[in-house]
Curated annotation (Swiss-Prot):
The lineage of its organism: Eukaryota, Metazoa, Ecdysozoa, Arthropoda, Hexapoda. Signal peptide: none annotated. Associates with active polyribosomes. The gene is CNBP. Keywords: Cytoplasm, Endoplasmic reticulum, Metal-binding, Nucleus, Phosphoprotein, Repeat, Zinc, Zinc-finger. It comes from Drosophila melanogaster. GO terms for biological process: IRES-dependent translational initiation of linear mRNA; positive regulation of cytoplasmic translation; wing disc morphogenesis. This is CCHC-type zinc finger nucleic acid binding protein. Single-stranded DNA/RNA-binding protein with sequence specificity. Binds G-rich elements in target mRNA coding sequences. Prevents G-quadruplex structure formation in vitro, suggesting a role in supporting translation by resolving stable structures on mRNAs. IRES trans-acting factor (ITAF) that can promote IRES-dependent translation of Myc mRNA. Involved in the control of wing size by regulating Myc levels.
């Protein structure tokens, strides 16, 4: 095993999450779920390891734990947030609830609350260097060359020495 491996639970090098002494699950599928029974979709960290306040349970629709550790017996509907049924059996009108901000009326992909890998913060755009949006949502339409730093062309079109590799 490479010493450059970084643990997704504690963010320290030298081991994988499945071997982490922090514990707390993760299982064979590791962070992000997937193969072998997985550990769910845990993202980011709070500097000291796992970020419990952002773990979202898809059984009760609350933050702080995953479904495998859910204290509620009954399942909660993602659509209306009601207890005792799931979204496919919901009789409420289709009014989506955002999993990021927990507000109704939009999906997470359209959420106005900016989030980066460390959680809800004021993100910055690498294209225009302004805060409040990410590059894919950047209002700036001009191209910026990563070789010379000037706008109006891309690196592959750069005529300056050292601009094109």
């Amino acid at each position: 095993m490479s010493m450059s491996a970084t643990c997704y639970k504690c963010n320290r090098p030298g081991h994988f999450a499945r071997d982490c002494s922090l514990g707390g699950g993760g299982g064979p599928g590791g962070v992000g779920g997937g193969g072998g029974g997985g550990g769910g979709g845990m993202r980011g960290n709070d500097g000291g390891g796992m970020r419990r306040n952002r773990e979202k349970c898809y059984k009760c629709n609350q933050f702080g734990h995953f479904a495998r550790a859910c204290p509620e017996e009954a399942e909660r509907c993602y659509r209306c947030n009601g207890i005792g049924h799931i979204s496919k059996d919901c009789t409420q009108a289709d009014n989506p609830t955002c999993y990021r901000c927990n507000k109704t009326g939009h999906w997470v992909r359209n959420c106005p609350e900016a989030v980066n890998e460390r959680g809800p913060t004021n993100v910055s755009c690498y294209k225009c260097n302004r805060t409040g949006h990410i590059s894919k949502n950047c209002p700036e339409t001009s191209k910026t060359c990563y070789g010379c730093g000037k706008s109006g062309h891309l690196r592959r079109e750069c005529d300056e020495k050292g601009g094109r590799n």
